[in-house]
Regions:
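Long, low-complexity, intrinsically disordered segments
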Residues: 456-466
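Periplasmic/cell-envelope proteins involved in peptidoglycan metabolism and beta-lactam response
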Residues: 2, 10, 191-194, 437-443
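Sec-dependent N-terminal signal peptides of Gram-positive bacterial secreted proteins and lipoproteins
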Residues: 2-26, 418-436
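Domain-terminus/edge residues, biased toward the C-terminal soluble/receptor-binding domains
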Residues: 199-200, 211-216, 220-423, 430-450, ...
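Active-site-adjacent loops and short helices of periplasmic peptidoglycan-processing enzymes
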Residues: 4, 16, 26-220, 224-233, ...
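Generic "edge-of-domain/loop-turn" microfeature
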Residues: 6, 18, 23, 92, ...
Length: 466
């Protein structure tokens, strides 16, 4: 009986395991390479210096796989110190380089790019931003702020400059309260906007990027957000300002002046004339994060680096050189295989390495008119189009085939459930039958023993009577 129970339990456990692995997936834990993972002593027993440990972590980060390197004929990208990174073509959304690009990481102050986007789309530059007591709670020691006072007022233009250049946390909070009506509603607006942009691994808990374990982005999502944000001329104007001064206010009698913090935009060691916008970030939990927009010969790219201990600017330059030197934009309308589509913009293009040909790409036209091009599953361009008249019948058949395939995929989990349940029921039925057979055998054995005992008693009685 116990064996039967154990068997039932094993079958049920196996069924549950199959359901968990085949149908559902666990939430991804946000993890980084940590000092705890590094051996603290050398082979001869000496304790390692902090610099040595940091160097080993950086080497491990460099060795993390780059997804795009696995693509056939794709030019291999540079090693970077960041645990995640991406290079996206701003003209068409093509992914030129991707390293852990869909993993979740803490963004720190690059969050403020989304804050700026939502603010610009839902306010006027002349709107008044008033600082509440709650907003001043962000003025922690060690965190960026510009010492705003309770009930102090500035306009939205001043506030956006303070947030994007000085990275002022209390200003980001006050912008959220002003635009959203409540701070909580503004954060909700940020998350809704992220979904509209196609972000799948992003969730915001605040407007300034201060650490929260439920506040995260992926490199791909951050590139999508930046691409949209930097399409706003007002934000580009702010980002390209080297120095800004907020005049005296209703409370402060002195001007506040601050400078651009992105070191590729100011004269110095890391200055790069190709850089036309970006945002820095850092917390103890996120390490260094950096977003940079670059332009060369009319081509624009956005570079995102997450979870980096060091060398973010050197890595950004290396990724920019890699992208501009090894990739080219191909106009879609000039390609023979694109003739099945109509109403494509003359400027629409894909971006691919010089060793990859357009004929090797796969295309997908979505119902909303979005035309996407892929190379071995990697996105290389997005535009809008319609199916040409002579291909509409073919397209309808393809759409029906895709819908049928989708329906099969949707019903597959339920089929698996029914199969597993059927297996469980069969096993249980067999166990019941086996237990019944075993019980019948025991009853038969008991009857045999009882008859044997009766015969022995009868024999004993006969002997006694004789």
């Amino acid at each position: 009986m116990r064996k039967g129970i154990r068997l039932i339990a094993s079958v049920l456990a196996g069924a549950i395991f199959m359901l968990n692995t085949g149908i559902t997936s666990c939430a991804e834990e946000i993890t980084y390479l940590l000092e705890e993972d590094i051996e603290k002593t050398t082979a001869d027993g000496k304790e390692k210096e902090p610099k040595e440990i940091k160097k080993e972590i950086i080497e491990k980060a460099k060795a993390l796989p780059v997804e795009t390197d696995a693509l056939k004929n794709w030019t291999k990208g540079p090693e970077i110190c960041g645990e995640a990174g991406i290079v996206m073509d701003m003209d068409n959304g093509a992914i030129l380089y991707g390293k852990s690009m869909d993993r979740k990481y803490y963004p720190a102050s690059i969050t403020k790019i989304m804050t700026a986007l939502v603010a610009l789309e839902n306010s006027q530059m002349t709107d008044t931003v008033t600082f509440s007591e709650q907003s001043l709670g962000c003025q922690h020691s060690g965190y960026a702020h510009i010492a705003m006072k309770k009930d102090e007022q500035i306009n939205m233009r001043d506030a956006l400059h303070a947030m994007m250049l000085a990275s002022a946390n209390e200003v980001a909070y006050a912008i959220g309260e002003t635009v959203g009506g409540t701070y909580e509603h503004f954060v909700q607006m940020m998350n809704e906007r992220a979904k509209e942009l196609g972000c799948e691994n992003t969730h915001f808990m605040n407007a300034n990027g201060m650490f929260d374990e439920n506040h995260y982005v992926s490199a791909r999502d951050m590139a999508l957000i930046t691409r949209e944000a930097f399409s706003k001329s007002e934000l580009l104007e702010i980002m390209q300002t080297p120095q800004y001064t907020i005049p005296v206010t209703n409370i402060a009698q002195e001007e506040r002046t601050f400078q651009q913090k992105h070191r590729m935009m100011v004269q110095g060691k890391y200055y790069d004339p190709r850089c036309f916008g970006g945002k820095t970030g850092y917390t103890d939990q996120s390490y260094n994060t950096l977003v940079t927009a670059m332009e060369e010969n009319g081509r624009k790219i956005v570079i995102v680096i997450l979870g980096s201990r060091d060398h973010t600017y050197e890595d950004t330059k290396a990724l920019a050189d890699y992208a501009f030197q090894n990739f080219e934009q191909i106009k879609i309308t000039e390609q023979e295989t694109a003739k099945k589509y109509s109403e494509i913009s003359e400027t629409a293009c894909v971006t691919i390495p010089k060793d990859v040909e357009f004929k090797d790409l796969e295309s997908e036209l979505k119902p909303n008119g979005e035309l996407r091009y892929f190379y071995e599953g990697n996105l290389v361009g997005v535009t809008t189009a319609k199916l040409a008249a002579e291909h509409k019948i073919e397209g309808a058949a393809l759409k029906a085939e895709q819908q049928e395939k989708k329906a099969k995929q949707e019903t597959k989990p339920w089929k698996m459930i029914w199969i597993i349940l059927a297996i469980v029921l069969i096993v249980i039925s067999l166990l019941v039958i086996l237990l019944q057979i075993r019980a019948a055998k025991k009853r038969k054995e008991r009857m045999r023993r009882r008859r044997a005992m009766q015969r022995r008693r009868q024999q004993q009685l006969r002997k006694r009577d004789s």
